[in-house]
Design a protein with these regions (language model features):
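Short Cys/His-rich Zn2+-coordinating modules
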Residues: 681-692, 727-737, 836-842
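Histidine-centered nuclease catalytic patch
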Residues: 708-749, 758-760
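Extended, highly charged accessory segments
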Residues: 225-228, 426, 468, 475-555, ...
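Short cysteine-rich loop/turn motifs with clustered Cys
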Residues: 688-720, 751-753
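Compositionally biased, low-complexity linear motifs
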Residues: 72-78, 126, 310, 733-739, ...
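Short metal-coordination and nucleic-acid-contact micro-motifs, chiefly zinc-binding Cys/His arrays
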Residues: 697-701, 743-747, 851
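Cys/His-coordinated zinc-binding microdomains
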Residues: 708, 755, 859-862
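Helicase motor core with emphasis on the C-terminal RecA-like subdomain
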Residues: 4, 8-51, 55-58, 62, ...
Length: 885
């Protein structure tokens, strides 16, 4: 069945069409050609002809001409538009003109580097055939963590064109630059592929690595030029210039041919309209993928997290296994990979994501190219430009977190002139539903800005350490455009890590600091996930490493008792050892997955900027975030119901970072309180509270009613209201409702850990909670960051006129959206500028949502027993109407 046949079947199916929120057809277009620049080396022109390339696309010719003028360029044409030739041609031209010239290609992943080397070798061999004296092919090499040690010295001696990633440049090449002296002295070009990936923490690290590279190049009297490529974002030129700290020329108009592409935005059907409950997106996406596979279309399915990808793989394989006993769709004619295979089975559907070992990834990539693998379920590891052939369909399960990533995933289908289809299956979450309702965000100008902050002091100090270990600093030397070099060198000198002799600064450590830091996070070395045999099962096999996770994420993803997915198999974490950086897991067969529960508290340190409106104050500044993983939920796979909540007790961590916040004025609080729409002040428990609290402690004999833990010396347990105090409607001076609320039957003594778990698992959501949910979920649409890059915290306010301390402003009700990176990366300042835009988007989201009391698509999930006076949607809407006025 062709793509057109499948689309016709979908169009004629009313059930399917009822789920379609948007269906956009992008017609195919022919190529627009231009001759190769006449200044291009004749041997290279002959090699292009030998490879069947008689002429270039116009944008390729423009890019090559700009590069040959020695301009830095950034190419932002779409996926499959021939960006590779835009940088290969000027690089190889330079090689032919200058026998000592070298080039460095940096890719964000190892897979991309290995993929590109094949095309490079093909072109280099064609050049060598035209001009045997060139001998370019032997000088091209990939250099990464998978490169065997015996090959590395040979590569250092022979390579002129090196394909690697920023991590290897950081940890292997720059610290050992003396061994690369000839290569660095001849460095003429640096290619940065997929620079939209270089944002946030990773991008800020990479910008500093490039500062170190350019500094070492100057030491060897080299001044390389840069060629960058990027997906569609709002600020590609700004990002490129921030990364390399030089001016760049943008090439953005594509003249490559393209086939017709259908983009479908699909909303999962409502199961309970009143509660806003929708069918699980993973089930909908798995069904769509199975339909595409049955139609004979090679299909890629994207999940936006490891857990989602592995759930999709499990559901898709299970569905194929159920059909195994009856004939299925044959493989496409001409596929020799499986000549005797008559139907697709579970073995032909593979997973692919970060954390898989290199051999697994290479095997899957080869299977996709050969056609043996009919479908792959991936995270964003395959959203990049790896050449895995012409996939006909892409199913994207859940909004990937950025518009650029969405189009990258759409672009995996239709990398030829054939017709293709890509479907975005929305989850019930707020961001997904907002994008589904506002398709202009996808189909018109992207609002996303990729932000980096190379001068984040935490990162800058680490990279100055590396730089001074690589080459001593002179007093008057610069480190890129950073204004803080002198301060950082003074700090390192004071700490004894750097010694000053006259006008020069020298590294005094024994080890190179690059080995002690990762570019992918601020969490240091990763936590290794290893499979172990269950205890007491006789002879035990040696542990087998099956994946890894960064330290910051480890308590959230591989805590004790967590279910970890890999290759469609469930594993249960037996023990997480954060000291040894190891998580031991065993294979299990369970029908649930897990979700960590964390508790946090935010303290305001410094306000950098703020402005007042009639009903609110907005600001951004520095905060301290105290966070702890305190438990986890078991959630049934099929129904997504919570099966149980279990305690954990990991070390409380403090993060000093930046935050944006919105503070509610006393006037708004008072207006909402009078209307019965404000439940976000800290409770005044009434005049008998001290007496009742003491009575509960005596009754329960100082032991937690949940876990039985006794009170520690000098630290009392908390007293918890079983029915929330605020539901009794106590107003001091007007009624005595506190007497009913504070009955001993409604009170229980609980330790602080159990209290946090009770509050987190079952606390009713208020208007501030709804506002927090909206702001934190909408922010990534404008920031081009992952939702996990931001945290949110609600600070309850003191009752009007009854502040706990004289400085009432420190106890005003606030919603903080904070960055999960030490010192921040600039997101908070951007959110501060976007405050009114965010409020209006939040108000529109609540007003347009069809649910009654609140749901994940607007103010967040609400409890089934949420009292009528605490309808989160009603409270949030009332608050937003005043804030956005």
């Amino acid at each position: 069945m062709s793509v057109a046949d499948l689309l016709a079947r979908w169009r004629s199916n009313p059930q399917f069409m009822n789920k379609v929120a948007a269906w956009r057809i992008f017609p195919g277009s022919p190529a627009v050609y231009a001759p190769a620049p006449p200044s291009l080396h004749p041997a290279l022109q002959g090699a292009l002809a030998a490879c069947g390339i008689q002429q270039l696309y116009v944008h390729q010719s423009e890019a090559v001409e700009a590069a040959l003028r020695q301009e830095n360029i950034v190419i932002t044409t779409p996926t499959a538009s021939g960006k590779t030739l835009c940088y290969n041609l000027p690089v190889l031209h330079t090689f032919l003109a200058e026998p000592a010239a070298c080039a460095l290609y940096l890719f964000p992943t190892k897979a991309l580097a290995h993929d590109q080397i094949e095309e490079l070798n093909r072109l280099a061999k064609a050049i060598d055939a035209v001009d045997p004296t060139a001998r370019l092919a032997p000088s091209i090499a990939a250099y990464d963590g998978d490169t065997p040690m015996p090959q590395r010295s040979r590569i250092r001696k022979r390579a002129r064109l090196l394909l690697t990633n920023p991590d290897m440049l950081h940890v292997s090449i720059l610290p050992n630059h003396a061994q690369w002296a000839d290569f660095l002295a001849g460095l003429r070009w640096v290619v940065l592929d997929e620079i939209h990936i270089y944002r946030g923490v990773f991008g800020s690290h990479v910008a500093n690595v490039l500062r170190r590279l350019q500094r070492i190049c100057r030491h060897y009297s080299a001044t390389p030029r840069f060629i960058c490529t990027s997906a569609t974002i709002a600020n590609p030129t700004q990002l490129a210039e921030r990364l390399i700290e030089q001016r760049v020329h943008q090439i953005e108009r594509s003249t490559a041919p393209r086939g017709e592409k259908h983009i479908i935005l699909l909303n999962t059907p409502l199961v309970d309209a009143e509660k806003g409950v929708r069918r699980a997106a993973v089930l909908e996406a798995a069904d769509l993928a199975a339909e595409c596979i049955d139609a004979g279309l090679q299909t890629i399915v994207f999940g936006r997290s490891r857990v989602a990808a592995e759930l999709l793989l499990t559901y898709l394989r299970a569905g194929l296994e159920r059909r195994r006993s009856r004939p299925g769709q044959p493989f496409p004619a001409g596929n020799q990979a499986v000549p005797n295979q008559t139907f697709v089975t579970a073995e032909h559907v593979q997973g692919y994501r970060g954390g898989y070992l290199p051999a697994e990834r290479r095997s899957i990539e080869a299977g996709l190219r050969s056609g043996l693998v009919r479908s792959v379920v991936a995270t964003n590891a395959l959203e990049l430009g790896i050449d895995i052939g012409g996939l006909a369909a892409a199913i994207v399960c859940g909004y990937p977190g950025s518009i650029a990533a969405t189009w990258q995933q759409f672009g995996r289908a239709g990398r030829t002139t054939d017709a293709a289809v890509a479907v975005l299956v929305a989850t019930a979450g707020l961001l997904d539903q907002y994008v589904i309702r506002h398709s202009e965000f996808l189909f018109e100008q992207s609002p996303e800005h990729a932000l980096i902050h190379p001068d984040n002091l935490m990162l800058l100090v680490d990279h100055v350490r590396c730089a001074v270990a690589e080459l001593p600093f002179h007093r008057d030397e610069a480190f890129g455009a950073s204004p803080y070099l002198a301060d950082v060198l003074a700090l390192l000198t004071e700490q004894g890590e750097v010694q000053r002799h006259g006008d020069r600064f020298f590294w005094s450590g024994l080890r190179h600091p690059a080995r002690e830091m990762s570019l992918r996070s601020v969490g240091g070395e990763p936590v290794i996930i290893q499979q172990v045999e269950p205890a007491g099962e006789g002879e035990r096999n040696a542990p087998c490493v099956i994946g890894e996770v960064d330290q910051v994420s480890a308590p959230l993803l591989v805590h004790d008792g967590a279910i970890y997915f890999h290759g469609g198999q469930s594993y249960q974490v037996q023990r997480l050892d954060l000291t040894a950086l190891r998580a031991d897991v065993t294979a299990v067969d369970v029908d649930y997955y897990t979700e960590a529960i964390s508790d946090s508290e935010v303290k305001l340190l410094t306000c950098h900027a703020g402005r007042s409106a009639e009903n609110s104050l907005t600001a951004w500044g520095d905060v301290a975030v105290h966070a702890q993983v305190i438990g986890y939920r078991k959630i049934k796979r099929t129904t997504h119901e919570t099966l149980g909540v279990y305690p954990l007790d990991y070390t409380r961590r403090t993060l000093e970072t930046s935050a944006y916040w919105c503070e509610i004025t006393p006037a708004v609080q008072q207006e909402l309180e009078v209307a019965g729409l404000w439940f976000d002040s800290v409770n005044d428990y009434g005049p008998n509270w001290v007496e009742q609290r003491a009575a509960v402690r005596a009754r329960d004999r100082g032991r937690c009613a949940v876990c039985g833990a006794p009170e520690a010396p000098g630290r009392q347990h908390d007293v918890h209201h079983k029915i929330p105090f605020r539901l009794f409607g106590y107003v001091p001076g007007l009624n005595e409702a506190y007497l009913e609320a504070n009955r001993l039957e409604n009170l229980m003594l609980v330790c602080r850990g159990c209290h946090r778990r009770i509050e987190t698992a079952g606390r009713y959501q208020t208007g501030l909670d709804g506002l927090a949910y909206l702001l934190s979920n909408l922010a990534p649409l404008y920031l081009m960051c992952d939702p996990g890059d931001l945290g949110v915290y609600v600070e309850r306010g003191s009752p009007i006129g009854r502040a706990a301390v004289p400085d009432a402003r420190t106890h005003a009700p606030r919603v903080f959206v904070y960055e999960r990176v030490p010192a921040g990366l600039g997101f908070s300042a951007q959110l501060y500028d976007l405050h009114e835009t965010l409020l209006n988007a939040a108000l529109e989201s609540v007003r347009s949502c069809p649910c009654v009391h609140g749901c994940p698509a607007c103010v967040g999930p609400v409890l089934d027993d949420q009292p009528l006076q605490l309808q989160t949607k009603r409270l949030t809407l009332a608050l937003l109407e005043r804030l956005a006025a």
